């Protein structure tokens, strides 16, 4: 269900690469890829190296490491960063039909979490990057989205998502909330 459009959009394999909503630099595939679902028939996975990445700290509910300057509607403001130990993987498209020829992901060695993503167009040029921060609940290990920054290097546009998590309702969540029929009927 997309509240801003007031409708449910059923995503199929052909439109998973479309923007989730108009004027966003975010496609369903980018959102879904953060769940780290893989398909070895469609993609080749190669560990490139081990190293470090400068990424937003995972600080739980202490504060938001992204503090954009709202007056300028741009990638300005303050972003706290820290060096994180990572494995770097390349995910190469084998179908020649995926929107990206390659994704390079930095997976945190301690948190097992994707810290940074670079996405390359069909010509091999850097197209988009992904950096995010989550709300972490240390006592349970649960996490929810907090902030996502997705710059489009080619068009010089970006999307910033700021999400307010509601921990009070976590215990009320179950798989029925994600059933397509229930989402379609939810008003």
Protein language model annotation of sequence segments:
Residues 42-77:
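Active-site environment of non-heme Fe oxygenases that use a 2-His-1-carboxylate facial triad
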Residues 177-186:
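Short, low-complexity, Pro/Ser/Thr/Gly-rich segments in the mature regions of secreted, periplasmic
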Residues 1-37, 71-178:
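Gly/Pro-enriched, hydrophobic low-complexity segments
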